């Protein structure tokens, strides 16, 4: 037994300068696990509740002292003396203590920080890397897989102050032989893109996730400048590198219309499906996240019927890492992949359940950061520990993003060739 001796929390800052919760779980052996909760900008309406203070005299109302108090009080009282190795029992105890469907009682940010800190403490107690401990919790056996990164090198939407409607334009170095080489390819393309933008007299400032955020005439132009950057870096688009989008469509969906204000165009669901299909015909786009609004299930059905056999269709705001909603998607053949974000559901155990349900149904699971991140690198270990095969953790700058990539480099080196880099085979519809 790895007895929990103490738990305490602290209000710290995330990468956007907003408060978040950091928790420490201390074991009787003296081992300490520390974790921070991330925070999103474009959020699904069904996500677990992030508890904020609402006190406008502090941090513009975004303080998390209530969540910190929940950790230092009720959560600590409930978990001290329990076994950190029994992750599911710890998470269940916190969910019972919270007593709500959306974690409004204690706050998903409070519960998650403790859940992850406990897992880290347990891994240290066992003397194994965190990814190995997560693999044990998940029931993962056999060869590990390193994740193919979705690198968000050009930002729009809620992640940038520009006129581009689609939120993320990403590259996937599928032709690389290893994660290390994939990271190198991505970095070289990132630097090439900066030169391409500068040559056009466009902004090379970056958005929340480290991607460039220039004003462009259309979403298609964003893809065109990325293609130019890929070629400038010496790679072949569609062979060495493929493209992925996060439309974050809920951010521009209103009254049944998809409004691309940057292009001055508006589409109904059928029209927007055709718009996305046309982009896929023009460019090697192999993955689209949140192609339709989170409430537009009919639109999602049409998108899946149109593109689902050849494009990975990832539900983020649609599924919010929630097994109940994911099951509906599986049953109704909506999408074919789920984005996994710890804080959408609020505990490690529930996150693992969502990955398991997806993989058992033949869906892929893409492990993801949030736009508001910290130096915490747990998602890197989660991606390897569950052999998810894909990770989305931003661009090739900003230390809150690069920290995850650097952690994956360490993991790959530790595994010394025991972990395969799956390339295109990791992406639904491409293997």
Curated annotation (Swiss-Prot):
Keywords: Cytoplasm, Glycolysis, Lyase, Magnesium, Metal-binding, Secreted. GO terms for biological process: glycolytic process. Pfam families: Enolase_C, Enolase_N. PROSITE patterns: ENOLASE. The active site is at residues 209, 341. It catalyses: (2R)-2-phosphoglycerate = phosphoenolpyruvate + H2O. Mg(2+) binds at residues 246, 289, 316. Binds a second Mg(2+) ion via substrate during catalysis. It is found in: Cytoplasm; Secreted; Cell surface. Its EC number is 4.2.1.11. (2R)-2-phosphoglycerate binds at residues 167, 341, 370-371, 392. Its cofactor is Mg(2+). One of its GO terms (cellular component) is extracellular region. It comes from the Bacteria. Gene3D superfamilies: Enolase-like C-terminal domain (3.20.20.120), Enolase-like, N-terminal domain (3.30.390.10). SUPFAM superfamilies: Enolase C-terminal domain-like (SSF51604), Enolase N-terminal domain-like (SSF54826). Pathway: Carbohydrate degradation; glycolysis; pyruvate from D-glyceraldehyde 3-phosphate: step 4/5. GO terms for molecular function: magnesium ion binding; phosphopyruvate hydratase activity. HAMAP family: Enolase. Belongs to the enolase family. Catalyzes the reversible conversion of 2-phosphoglycerate (2-PG) into phosphoenolpyruvate (PEP). It is essential for the degradation of carbohydrates via glycolysis. Component of the RNA degradosome, a multiprotein complex involved in RNA processing and mRNA degradation. This is Enolase.
């Amino acid at each position: 037994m790895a007895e929990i001796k103490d738990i305490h929390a602290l209000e710290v800052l995330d990468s956007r300068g907003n408060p978040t919760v950091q928790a420490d779980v201390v074991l009787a052996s003296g081992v300490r696990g520390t974790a921070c909760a991330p925070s999103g900008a474009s959020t699904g309406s069904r996500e677990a509740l992030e508890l904020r203070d609402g006190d406008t005299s502090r941090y513009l109302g975004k303080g998390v002292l209530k969540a910190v108090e929940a950790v230092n009080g009720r959560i600590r009282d409930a978990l001290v003396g329990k076994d950190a190795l029994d992750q599911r029992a710890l998470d269940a105890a916190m969910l019972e203590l919270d007593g709500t469907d959306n974690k409004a009682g204690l706050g998903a940010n409070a519960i998650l920080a403790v859940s992850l800190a406990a897992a880290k403490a347990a891994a240290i107690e066992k003397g194994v890397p965190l990814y190995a401990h997560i693999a044990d919790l998940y029931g993962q056996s056999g060869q590990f897989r390193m994740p193919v990164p979705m690198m968000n090198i050009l930002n729009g939407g809620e992640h940038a102050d520009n006129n581009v409607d689609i939120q993320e334009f990403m590259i996937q170095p599928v032709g690389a032989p290893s994660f290390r080489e994939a990271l190198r390819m991505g970095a070289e393309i990132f630097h090439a893109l900066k030169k391409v933008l500068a040559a056009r007299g466009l902004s090379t400032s970056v958005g929340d996730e480290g991607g460039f955020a220039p004003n462009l005439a259309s979403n298609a132009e964003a893809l065109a400048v990325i293609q130019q950057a890929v070629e400038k870096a010496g790679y072949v688009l569609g062979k060495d590198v493929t493209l992925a989008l996060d439309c974050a469509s809920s951010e521009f969906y209103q009254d049944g219309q998809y409004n691309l204000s940057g292009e001055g165009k508006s589409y109904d669901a059928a029209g927007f499906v055709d718009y996305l299909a046309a982009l896929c015909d023009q460019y090697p786009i192999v993955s689209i996240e949140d192609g339709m609004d989170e409430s537009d299930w009919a639109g999602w059905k049409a998108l899946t019927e149109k593109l689902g056999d050849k494009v990975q269709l990832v539900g983020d705001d649609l599924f919010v890492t929630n097994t109940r909603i994911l099951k509906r998607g599986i049953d109704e053949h909506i999408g074919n992949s789920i984005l996994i974000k710890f804080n959408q559901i609020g505990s490690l155990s529930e996150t693992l359940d969502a990955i398991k349900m997806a993989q058992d149904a033949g869906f892929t699971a893409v492990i993801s950061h949030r736009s508001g991140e910290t130096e915490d690198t747990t998602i890197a270990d989660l991606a390897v520990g569950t052999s998810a095969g894909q990770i989305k953790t931003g661009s090739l700058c900003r230390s809150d993003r690069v920290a995850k990539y650097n952690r994956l480099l360490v993991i790959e080196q530790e595994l010394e060739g025991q972990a395969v880099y799956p390339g295109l085979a990791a992406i639904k519809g491409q293997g």
